């Protein structure tokens, strides 16, 4: 367990330290492409882990980012890692914390932020309401009859509005 303040400190430190190896080169992940999600974004007082979403600029890079993740100046070990999710244990101020990393493409960003911010109970209610209208919502997009529904949105707030719901700041989602 860690406090919200500790979680924020870890995220701020990671913003300048995350990179991945690609074709023998170390590629820095831009701070603007790293965002806190999960309980940290909901500003819960106590956190089980730190969840970060990394926006990947090109689809071809997805398979390289997480499996080849590097954290400058921090000791870490990988528990499990794939193209879309990686669970690490990082050493921070003489303690070990779990860091969950997720990836999304730029066009998936609003959906991924919404999905990974949660909480699960809130997502279940939204998805149940959408299911009645034959829609499926996940971290990759909005689908109707298994077909992606193109929405001209760039933010989570626009997504919620487009779906016909009232936007709630993450802190107030139940």
From Swiss-Prot:
GO terms for biological process: double-strand break repair via nonhomologous end joining. Residues 42-51 are annotated as: Involved in ssDNA binding. It holds the Pfam family DNA_pol_B_thumb. The record marks 115 as: Stabilizes dGTP in a syn conformation to overcome the Watson-Crick base pairing constraint. In the presence of magnesium, pol X shows a strong preference for the ssDNA gaps having one and two nucleotides. Its EC number is 2.7.7.7. It catalyses: DNA(n) + a 2'-deoxyribonucleoside 5'-triphosphate = DNA(n+1) + diphosphate. It is an enzyme of class 2 (transferase). One of its GO terms (cellular component) is virion component. Its cofactor is Mg(2+). It is found in: Virion. Mg(2+) binds at residues 49, 51, 100. It comes from the Viruses. The keyword Hydrolase does not apply. GO terms for molecular function: DNA binding; DNA-directed DNA polymerase activity; metal ion binding. Error-prone polymerase lacking a proofreading 3'-5' exonuclease which catalyzes the gap-filling reaction during the DNA repair process. Specifically binds intermediates in the single-nucleotide base-excision repair process. Also catalyzes DNA polymerization with low nucleotide-insertion fidelity. Probably acts as a strategic DNA mutase, which gives rise to a rapid emergence of variants. Generates mismatched G-G pairs, in that case, the polymerase first binds the deoxynucleotide followed by mismatch formation. Small DNA polymerase formed from only a palm and a C-terminal subdomain. The total DNA-binding site of pol X is composed of two DNA-binding subsites. This is Repair DNA polymerase X. It comes from African swine fever virus (isolate Pig/Kenya/KEN-50/1950).
């Amino acid at each position: 367990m860690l406090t919200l303040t500790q979680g924020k400190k870890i995220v701020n430190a990671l913003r300048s330290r995350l990179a991945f190896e690609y074709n023998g080169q170390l590629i820095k992940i831009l701070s603007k492409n790293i965002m806190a999600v999960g309980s940290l974004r909901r500003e819960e007082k106590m956190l089980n882990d730190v969840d970060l979403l990394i926006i990947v600029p090109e689809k071809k890079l997805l398979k390289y980012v997480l499996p080849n993740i590097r954290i400058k100046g921090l000791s870490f070990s990988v528990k499990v890692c794939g193209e879309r999710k990686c669970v690490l244990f990082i050493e921070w101020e003489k303690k070990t914390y779990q860091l969950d990393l997720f990836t999304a493409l730029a066009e998936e960003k609003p959906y991924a932020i919404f999905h990974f911010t949660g909480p699960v109970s809130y997502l279940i209610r939204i998805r149940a309401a959408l299911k009645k209208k034959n829609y499926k919502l996940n971290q990759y997009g909005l689908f109707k009859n298994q077909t992606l529904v193109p929405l001209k949105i760039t933010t989570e707030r626009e997504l919620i509005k487009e779906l016909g719901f009232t936007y709630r700041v993450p802190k107030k989602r139940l």
